[in-house]
Amino acid sequence: MSDVYETCPAFENDKFLLRFSQLDDAEDLVSVYSDKNALPFFNSDNCHGDNFYYPNEDRMRQAIKFWLSSYSSKWFVRWTIIDKEKHEAIGTIEVFHRSTNDNFNHVGVLRLDLKSEYETSEEIFTIMNLIVPPTFDLFECEEIITKVPVYAVERIEAMKRVGFKKSTKLLDGTMDGYAYKDYWIINRGVYSPLDDLEAKEKA
């Protein structure tokens, strides 16, 4: 698990590039995190009350500084998602290894934040197939969980295609003690996307 905090790999396919988030991403990412149509799909569980709505570039830069600080502290890794055709950041992915005494101990937690126009089954499926396979080894986990609210119909379809299944278990908030629902889970042994999309690690 320590390797990813020493050198963060990038991943890409024909459409998207996932690479370590940078402060300069703020200019593009503010359009993601100020997108009120995207906001309901962000996972802010156990995040000190932050709802990830950043209405200006100043606030966006503050958030990215926190992401970079968290990476240095080995709390989580944040990748920026680049649309290769537009040369534009259209979202981020956060992943970390969760160690706690609840139903989701020693799992990888994956958070996907996207600009609302990319909240489609096809786009999500393409992005998830870049990050899910390497996550098991990078974060030393046998299972990965991600939150998918019941109204996120496009995301639900994409997660099913990747191989995730809805869990009935609740996630205990280590910060607030609240029990969070709507988590989907995938096991390393059953990862088998229904479509054959090839992702390659960028050297």
Can you say where each PLM-predicted feature lies in the sequence?
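A short helix-loop-beta-strand connector motif used in the catalytic cores of GNAT acetyltransferases and
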Residues: F52, R59-T80
